[in-house]
């Protein structure tokens, strides 16, 4: 199935979200290289409205933002992440009716593999409970907001064709693996695990799924008001550089809980990603902040920002994007997309810091300074 692309403006930017303008108050100014220049600021959320399950891809100086739309898949393209709210959003694909992927299009991710763009997304059959599965689209245009997206089909383990969402790509030594969140079987509904499988090509698995994370801790089992079966979802790969440890960052507990959070598992040195025992060091890494009114932070993506200083040295920052709510005990409140800088611990593990309040000045990514 191929779809022509439609483009429209995301939303008018409000007065309070003037992204990365020079600060007008001297008390919030800071120095950057070269000395004497004022830092530019932005405020979260970086885009208006409900944008759950945010994801960012980047290539050739452009950032591509995706989030759950439900009925279609759209991409917003920008050169500056702090100005995402000004970006044009392009609807790149709308599913046909009466298929196994016609509704509930969730958590799309955009990846550039083997010279082409691929979108991985969850979807379901209208009127059929628990029919959520993962699917793949392909586009050979250099710009994923242009050209045609071709439906490649369902990506799944044929021996274990179970409920599946939140698919992503993990690449190790030029080999791609598919990671996702799913059920063990239909008799154990609503308990979500993280699975991994090797890939034959960008739309086909070459081996059976392997479970690499199970919700065993209380912090992985929060529903809005009680402990449930447990949820691990939204897996995404993270590695500082080729000599650093490999992590899968995932979201834990039910998305509607204030205690929804980010967590990690780490592939041990020289470990086999298809061996469950080689995934170690599970722990929470980013949680709610009652003080800063950030609740249910999770389902994140990553991007980098780079700039060359006047000495010819390249400086690179790591950032993450995530969704959260700004009111407690309100599971139906829209989830907004926010970005924060990611730093690193001495052992190569990520340091997400604390969740930052909305509406406060945050220095822009370095490529915007």
What are these regions (language model features)?
Residues 20-369:
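Carbohydrate-active catalytic/glycan-binding domains of CAZyme proteins
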Residues 1-32:
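Bacterial Sec-dependent N-terminal signal peptides
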